[in-house]
C-alpha cells in the first residue's frame, strides 16, 4: 500500500483535487481534506485502501473512458463523453442561453396546447446515452422526445435518456463548432435521431437535418434568422419564427 507521502506525490502527478479524489474513491470530501492536510494522523484502514486503490492506478487515456468514469466526475465539472473521449464544455455565453430559451418557449407552449401529444422538450444539461453506448454520454442544448408507449425501445429516468431523441438542437460556440457539426452529426444519425438542428448565432444560420431509419432524408436545409422553420416532431405543426427571435435578441446584434 502507498504511504501517505507517496499518495500526496501521486495526487500531484495525476492532477487530482481533493474533490476529484472524493468523487472517484467514495471517501467523503471532508475526510480526504483531513488526510491530505495532515489533520488526521491515523485514518481508518478501509479509507486508506480506497485511496490506495484510486491513486495506484495509471490514469486512463483519451478514448478509454466509459460512462462509469463520466458519472464519477465532480458535479461541477461539465463535460461530454464521445467515443471514450472526454470533452470539457466551456461556460455558455448570454447569447447562447438566450437563444436556447427563446426556442424552448414556443416548444413548451405548443405542448401545453396539445396535451394529447405524448411529447417532452428538455433543456440542457440533460444526459443522453445514445444507443446505450457505454463510451458516449452527450448533453445537447435542447432535446425533444415523442414517447411511443410500450413499444418504445428507449428508457428515460430522472438522470438520463437511454437511446436516441426524436429532436436535438445545438447552438454553436467557438469551442464546440467542429464537434457539433461533424462528430455529433454522425453520432446522432447513427443512433437513430429523427431531426437535428444546428443553430449558428454568429452567422445567423440554422441548418436542419432530418433522418429516417438512420438515413438522411434529403440534403440538409439552411435557413437564416429571418425564416420560419417547421418542426418534424410536431408533424410540422409547430413553427419556430427565427425572425421574431432575432428581434427579441436585438441587443446582441447591434
Regions found by a protein language model. Name each.
Residues 2-16, 23-24, 29-30, 34-39, ...:
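Gly/Pro/Ser/Thr-rich low-complexity, intrinsically disordered segments predominantly at protein N-termini
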Amino acid at each position: 500500500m502507498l504511504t501517505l507521502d507517496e499518495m500526496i506525490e501521486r495526487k500531484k502527478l495525476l492532477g487530482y483535487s481533493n474533490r476529484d479524489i472524493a468523487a472517484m474513491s467514495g471517501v467523503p470530501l471532508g475526510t480526504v481534506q483531513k488526510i491530505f492536510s495532515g489533520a488526521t494522523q491515523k485514518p481508518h484502514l478501509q479509507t486508506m485502501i480506497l485511496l490506495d486503490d484510486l491513486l495506484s492506478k495509471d490514469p486512463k487515456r483519451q478514448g478509454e473512458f466509459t460512462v462509469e468514469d463520466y458519472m464519477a466526475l465532480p458535479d461541477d465539472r461539465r463535460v461530454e463523453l464521445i467515443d471514450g473521449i472526454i470533452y470539457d464544455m466551456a461556460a455558455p455565453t448570454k447569447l447562447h442561453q438566450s437563444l436556447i430559451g427563446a426556442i424552448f418557449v414556443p416548444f413548451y407552449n405548443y405542448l401545453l396546447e396539445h396535451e394529447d401529444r405524448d411529447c417532452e422538450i428538455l433543456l440542457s444539461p440533460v444526459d443522453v446515452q445514445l444507443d446505450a453506448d457505454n463510451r458516449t454520454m452527450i448533453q445537447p442544448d435542447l432535446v425533444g422526445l415523442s414517447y411511443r408507449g410500450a413499444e418504445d425501445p428507449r428508457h428515460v429516468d430522472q438522470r438520463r435518456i437511454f437511446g436516441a431523441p426524436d429532436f436535438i438542437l445545438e447552438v454553436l460556440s467557438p469551442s464546440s463548432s467542429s464537434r457539433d457539426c461533424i462528430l455529433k452529426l454522425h453520432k446522432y444519425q447513427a443512433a437513430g435521431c429523427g431531426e437535428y438542428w444546428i443553430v449558428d448565432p454568429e452567422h445567423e444560420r440554422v441548418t436542419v437535418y432530418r433522418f429516417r431509419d438512420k438515413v438522411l432524408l434529403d440534403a440538409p436545409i439552411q435557413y437564416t434568422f429571418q425564416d420560419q422553420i417547421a418542426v418534424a416532431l410536431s408533424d410540422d405543426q409547430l413553427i419556430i419564427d427565427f425572425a421574431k427571435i432575432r428581434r427579441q435578441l436585438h441587443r446582441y446584434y447591434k
